């Protein structure tokens, strides 16, 4: 049975005059349609993901295609049971993806070769190839291509510095890079070329497109793909499912992300429902005892209940040491 909602994912590097004015107009239009989602607009283009009914998303796509700037923009479509967002944001930003380079990269001028899923799949298996995940560490930890390098970064803007520190491992290699939908790799692969790396390619359409390819069927992907909406993750490999995520507290296989209940921390943790309960969705003792702990507020916990939970954790910690 066809689902009644869809999630759209798209981007286009294209010059947008008066982006702040276009941002306000686009927000109004999206709200009128009843869409929910997050869209970034800058002078260098548009990068968005929205959810809505089939009818709403169809109207939205038709409007985008009617604009000469976005007429040839690929739009990835996922069926959904309902909205994947809670609100509608359209924001103006200086960059579509934040790299803060002194010498900025224009992907329309300099970017890596685009590889279709089958070509990417075959190139990954070349022993002279190195595959770099251009996403954040918490995205990698939930799922990644088999054998891909995990840059130790918490934000995309940290990636160039990480590459500079590890450039020896890339010397003489064919470089493949990938991200969720492709927007980050457009700039990152261009930056690699500017830094003198000669053989640089990127996964055309990103992980999302790779998982939908009827021939490759997501093979050589392990785990789930992290997405920035209420779904949190989506499947990729349609041939075999290998769980690589590990529970933050116990290390057991898990693919469920939560955020630390201390708003000042908000650390992303892979965590089972049982351990979310046991540890009050908090990454540390300091976060569990923080006066602003959201888990405590959500469950209306009394101080007695909090103390009982803390005592149990302390008892088990001592037992583990002994």
Curated annotation (Swiss-Prot):
The active site is at residue 179. Its EC number is 1.14.-.-. Coiled coil: none annotated. GO terms for molecular function: oxidoreductase activity, acting on paired donors, with incorporation or reduction of molecular oxygen. It is an enzyme of class 1 (oxidoreductase). The keyword Oxidoreductase applies. Catalyzes oxygen-dependent 5-hydroxyuridine (ho5U) modification at position 34 in tRNAs. This is tRNA uridine(34) hydroxylase.
